[in-house]
A protein has these predicted regions:
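Class I S-adenosyl-L-methionine
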Residues: 1-106
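A contiguous loop/helix-start segment that scaffolds small-molecule binding in enzyme catalytic cores
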Residues: 3, 78-79, 154-233
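Generic hydrophobic alpha-helical segments
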Residues: 20, 66-70, 147, 151, ...
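A short acidic, often aromatic-flanked loop/helix-cap motif at beta-alpha or helix-coil junctions
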Residues: 60-66, 115, 170-171, 210-212
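Short, surface-exposed amphipathic charged segments that create phosphate/polyanion-binding patches used
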Residues: 68-75, 121-126, 144-150, 215-223
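Class I SAM-dependent methyltransferase SAM-binding "motif I" and its flanking Rossmann-like core
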Residues: 85-161
């Protein structure tokens, strides 16, 4: 029948749009994609507010097992796939849309606020941002060259760089602003390129889109010791 991919916004169960809520209530099956981001409320709170059981969909279910789960249900049921932020903010969701269309499943998209719009709370002008990059959980086996390359390219055009920090919600693991700065400093030292140093001006954010966000600016060395509170950062 149909697959509705519904953005939930960034904070809690009440950030869903009216249209999105109507679609959730009309759905036969409701999934929540739970690995690209996280809401700041519990699953049972969502279920109570929506009046529906919510199936937590991890990476395996959405990507490698979608044919057996989400898309299989959508062949003859109304399925809602809930996504924190905006539905089209990750390539994962674009992939499942393509696969659904290949199966002639009707697709409906309900947008919502995402980090790409909420970053405006920093006071930085959105049109002055360049390419975005992600910082993965750092280890000696995983060099983080891409973020530094993006920062370098954006500097040449005098553009800001939005860096998205890694997270692993099923295992309650979230990268902090402090860890991200440390990873960038270490990588830049390793490369000996000076792209990101202790004096680099940064803006660190946590819990954007909620009632108590933390936004702090300063040099990398200063922010590396600041407390940004609970995730997500």
């Amino acid at each position: 029948m149909s697959l509705s991919i519904i953005g939930l916004g960034l904070f809690d169960e009440k950030d869903i749009t009216v249209r999105g809520l109507e679609m959730v209530k009309a759905a036969d099956v409701v999934y929540l994609e739970c690995y690209t981001s996280v809401l700041q409320c519990r699953q049972d709170v969502l279920e109570s507010f929506y009046g529906k059981n919510v199936i937590m969909a991890d990476r395996e279910m959405v990507e490698s097992k979608a044919e057996e789960t989400i898309l299989s249900d959508a062949k003859d049921k109304k399925v809602a796939l809930l996504v924190v932020g905006d539905p089209l903010g990750a390539t994962t969701h674009e992939d499942i849309i393509v696969r659904a269309r290949d199966k002639n499943i009707e697709i409906m998209i309900v947008p919502n606020a995402s980090i790409f719009s909420s970053i405006g709370a920093t006071g930085l002008q959105l049109y002055k941002f360049g390419k975005t990059a992600s910082i993965p959980f750092y280890s000696s086996e995983i060099p983080i060259d891409t973020p530094l390359n993006v920062i370098s390219d954006n500097k040449k055009s005098k553009s800001h760089t939005l860096l998205l920090l890694d997270l692993d919600p099923p295992n309650d693991r979230f990268m902090s602003v402090n860890d991200a700065i440390s990873a960038l400093l270490n990588a830049s030292v390793r490369r000996k390129d000076g792209i990101f140093g202790p004096d680099t001006l940064c803006v660190g954010c946590a819990r954007l889109g909620g009632p108590s966000p933390t936004i702090k600016s300063g040099s990398a060395s200063l922010l590396s010791f600041e407390d940004f509170g609970k995730p997500p950062h």
